[in-house]
UniProtKB/Swiss-Prot annotation:
Gene Ontology annotations for the cellular component aspect, listed alphabetically: cytoplasm
Entry's localization field: Cytoplasm
Organism: Verminephrobacter eiseniae (strain EF01-2)
Protein name according to UniProt: Phenylalanine--tRNA ligase alpha subunit
Comment on bound cofactor: Binds 2 magnesium ions per tetramer.
Reactions the enzyme catalyzes: tRNA(Phe) + L-phenylalanine + ATP = L-phenylalanyl-tRNA(Phe) + AMP + diphosphate + H(+)
Reported cofactor(s): Mg(2+)
Principal subcellular localization: cytoplasm
Annotated keywords: Aminoacyl-tRNA synthetase, ATP-binding, Cytoplasm, Ligase, Magnesium, Metal-binding, Nucleotide-binding, Protein biosynthesis
Subunit architecture: Tetramer of two alpha and two beta subunits.
GO biological process, one term: phenylalanyl-tRNA aminoacylation
Listed GO MF terms: ATP binding; magnesium ion binding; phenylalanine-tRNA ligase activity; tRNA binding
Amino acid sequence: MNELDSLVESARQRFAQSTSPADLENAKAQFLGKSGRVTELMKGMAQLCVAEKKTRGAAINLAKQAIEAALNARRQALADAQLQQQLTADALDVSLPGRQRGQGGLHPVSLTLERIEGLFGSMGFDVADGPEIETDWFNFTALNTPEDHPARSMHDTFYVEGGTAGAPNLLRTHTSPMQIRHAVQHVKAHRAALDAGQPMPEIRVIAPGRAYRIDSDATHSPMFHQCEGLWIGENVGFKDLKVIFTGFCRRFFESDDLVLRFRPSFFPFTEPSAEIDIRFQTGPLAGRWLEVAGSGQVHPNVVRNMGLDPEKYIGFAFGMGLDRLTMLRYGVSDLRLFFDGDIRFLSQFR
């Protein structure tokens, strides 16, 4: 083995002994650095003739290439070993049972809304929808609310930008505007039949959604959920209201012995008007009268604002708080619990 072969073999052995990238770089310097052994051999050719330089230089370059190849091979081996070590440290046991994803559920008020829509849907009622930012006309005027009614004041109603002095915009204070919008569209769709003296299909609709009033305590929230119902036809009376609402309450609370009481009251959009109370015969609320809704026969002015003749068309309306119904159904005493976002509370309703 000549000098150059011995040098290459020595470099290979030194590289093989390197156990880290830093140690390998030190070994590289011993052979390929500025003061390395290969560099020293190149410097030693200064005293050779031209022909000898050519032969000697070619041999040294071959040795240098062999050393560089050994260096790169060892460098790659160290990198592969480091990668394998990292993969081993980060390895996952795929045979372990996985973590189950948390199971979500509907909010209790949403459960109540679904139940109400299903019950009234089985009685032939459609479900209306409408904007939460309303005009003064749909929220108050169309519902026969006087200009000086306290509900119109800024102490009770959230007014918003975008309207005019004579027609301000506001956050709807109830879901009744959806009933008016639905009725107006219904009448427009059947205007030709009405003008021809033909009967119009009845308006039978519920209007569930969010409403807003300036109020906040254990039983009230500035934002609350409401569901109102409307039935307009040529021969719809208070007796129909009692039958429909009694049937709804008994099915909603799953209590056939539930008792309902209709108390005279006043609302500008109905005449006559009544508050509806319920009384359970059994359970923790047994024997107590609990107010659940307002109702009445639709006022002639409201029927007229729908585009109908109040001499021919009549009907009833009712409105109930979804939050209160949810509180009664699940035995919750503080309305604010529904909106605090506490998963410990909400998970009970899955």
